[in-house]
């Protein structure tokens, strides 16, 4: 693809980055390359590809033209050097840590996270010998105090799911920098339209592309984006990137590929061995979804804040956690990191606790009761009985998912219709 003007705005890049006309046919909509493999020119060409000496495509578990277009688009929008698209957001988190971790090593993790991530890091990673150290999300000093010689990464969400907690990315990035480890930020809830964590010091950014990026609840996927700024050769903590790789005749990724080292490793080894590749069809759906991302997110944010203000005044509601409300303890951080809006996913507490929460779900009509977020449709969930069900009560409360909590993902419908549906459901609680 020809080089885009560096001064193009976000909306322009969302449409054009990574999406050149098809060179074979001239088709303007980027094609779906639904293939497993690619014909080599000759034996030397095949050898150069397998030796990582030439760019190109080998097998769609590693690389695919449609997937590569999505990687370029997402890396551009996040201000990164390269990207690796995966089969899901959970896979992206694992791929982000895979080159960094080893048995016995630690990752410091914010305690306010998506429930699936807490399970993944707190339980499943133990089978790899990786140890997750959970700390208070709202206290950067807690991250500093948790650093040890075994620390290999710090992981946070820019805007925590489900509670809408805005993380102090800049302060935590300083802790990671002092410790000599990468800061990994999950930017799913904010999207690069609202927040670009790399501007605040993040080294790696992950997304569940399933959510706002694809935008219509029809394509599962994830991505890891590398800033290209972390200096892997400065210490011995990351031998996967800084020492010779026997699989590739002693090639050292950091020396050979420089600021693309992490991305090249992710394709050549992580995807090769873990196999968590995204299908070309899902990549194509997401490519098309991103073209309207700015328009959708503006409406999501506008509707979300309108609904939050309505709920804040409702007699059946105990509290509302939305960083766009002036009453929110995260209001100032929201203005700093997400000046154009703090998203449309937030929580509120219904009076009556667990049972009222379940009744609320059964009383809505416009809302869909699903586990997804970031859809054009308005969605509702009771985290304590679903996404955070496997956690202990203490973990649920720490993550902002107590028994009374309802999570909303506000869609792009008419705000007055969304409010009317919530109003009739709240009235049914008595």
Regions found by a protein language model. Name each.
Residues 2, 81, 104, 122-123, ...:
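PLP-dependent enzyme catalytic core of the Aspartate aminotransferase-like
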Residues 2-64, 72:
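N-terminal "arm"/small-domain region of PLP-dependent enzymes with the aminotransferase-like
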Residues 19-21, 34-40, 211, 228-229, ...:
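Glycine-rich beta-alpha junction loops
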Residues 42-94, 116-123:
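Conserved N-terminal alpha-helix of the aminotransferase class I/II PLP-enzyme fold
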Residues 55, 81, 220, 282, ...:
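Short amphipathic alpha-helical segments
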Residues 297, 305, 311-312, 316-406, ...:
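Conserved C-terminal alpha-helix-loop-beta "cap" of PLP-dependent enzymes
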